[in-house]
Amino acid sequence: MNIILVEGMDGAGKTTLVEKLKALNTDILCKHFTHKDVEATPDPILRYVQHLEYASEQQASTVIFDRGWYSDMIYENILRGGWHAVSAEQISIVERLCKSYGDLTVVFVTTSVNSAWARCKQRGEDLITSKDLLKKVSAAYNEAIKLAKLSSLGMVYEVKT
């Protein structure tokens, strides 16, 4: 099974990329993670294992996570005071689990803060309420990209929109 994790700040173009990938292959299962998933299953390892097992049972050739463990790490720290934040050690565990199911590819979708802010305002984003907050999120993703390139067990790509 191919596992593709698509990460990036609000307004970067993640969901647009995921929709394009889904159009290329009908044998794709996609899971868009939101803060409600974190609240429902606070344990990040269990949260992702449940979806990997489901994809495996469905015999999907590819599973796409629209957001994932890097978003958990960033947004939980910046927006929610770290209550359910994911640690670097937990990221390593989740990625090892992913590798036990198949190939892992991590794609960071990036854009300028100005472009992302315009998209967030256009669609009425509820979590990102200011450009300053988006700047913090963008800076955290830049650090996450560095971390992933150094330690991820999968292939890591950055796609600029």
Region locations from a protein language model:
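Class I (Rossmann-like) S-adenosyl-L-methionine-dependent methyltransferase catalytic domain
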Residues: 3, 37, 68, 121-125
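Conserved substrate/cofactor phosphate-moiety recognition/catalytic segment
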Residues: 9-12, 16-61, 71-75
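Conserved phosphate-donor/acceptor-positioning beta-strand/loop module used by diverse small-molecule
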Residues: 66-68, 87-91, 99-120
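A mobile, often basic/glycine-rich helix-loop segment
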Residues: 73-92
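Hydrophobic anchor at the beta1->P-loop junction of P-loop NTPases
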Residues: 6
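Glycine-rich, phosphate-binding/catalytic loops in enzymes
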Residues: 22-23, 80-83, 123-126
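Residue-level preference for the first positions of well-ordered beta-strands
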Residues: 3, 61-64
